[in-house]
Amino acid sequence: MASKLNEEAQSEFKEGFALYDGNKDGKLEAAELANTLRWLGQNPSQSEINEILREFGSNNQMGVDGLFNYLGRKVVDDFDEKEIIEAFQVFDKDGKGMIGASDLRHILTNLGERLPEEQVEEMLRQAVGSGDGAINYEPFVRNMLKK
């Protein structure tokens, strides 16, 4: 899951982890995790902290990999399906729910967080087989959000 985070994000998250790992044991306890997440701009409740530790940590502690896994999922979950589909609609010239593979390639490699060419090729292969046809973007978005 850490692969969903770019190197810059991973570096920032490691910095927060190191800053709030008070006893420098490589693990964040509940209070340390809460402070780390607040430093990263989140405001979790105590029950949310407990839930995060249950799901991504062990023995009420979380290592840096657990933090990456949680934040990687959070980054994906923060993108609402409807918002992503609305973004695709900007590139849907005919209003038919389709986008050209070349347009999708351009979006994925040139806008926002640029994806590596290999990852784009795999996504296009899954979406249209040969990678050169039109893509029905609603099912494409749903499929990408499941991963």
Swiss-Prot record:
User: Entry's Pfam families?
Assistant: EF-hand_7
Subunit structure as annotated in this protein's UniProt entry: Myosin I is a dimer of a heavy and a light chain. Inability to self-assemble into filaments. Interacts with myoD. Does not interact with myoB or myoC.
Q: Does the keyword Repeat apply?
A: yes
Q: What does this protein do?
A: Functions as the light chain for myosin-D. Has low affinity for calcium.
Task: Check the record and name the PROSITE patterns matching this protein.
Answer: EF_HAND_1, EF_HAND_2
What InterPro entries is this protein classified in?
A: CALM/Myosin/TropC-like, EF-hand-dom_pair, EF_Hand_1_Ca_BS, EF_hand_dom
Superkingdom per UniProt:
Eukaryota
Q: What is this protein called?
A: Myosin-ID light chain
Q: Which residues cross the membrane?
A: none
GO molecular-function annotation terms? calcium ion binding; enzyme regulator activity; myosin heavy chain binding
**Which positions bind Ca(2+)?**
D21, N23, D25, K27, E32
Q: What is its main location?
A: cytoplasm
Gene Ontology CC annotation, any one: cytoplasm
Alphabetized, the UniProt keywords read: Calcium, Cytoplasm, Metal-binding, Motor protein, Myosin, Repeat
Where, per UniProt, does this protein localize?
Cytoplasm
Traced from the root, the source organism's taxonomic lineage reads: Eukaryota, Amoebozoa, Evosea, Eumycetozoa, Dictyostelia
Domain called EF-hand: residue spans: 8-43, 79-114, 115-147
Give GO BP annotations, semicolon-separated.
Answer: microtubule cytoskeleton organization
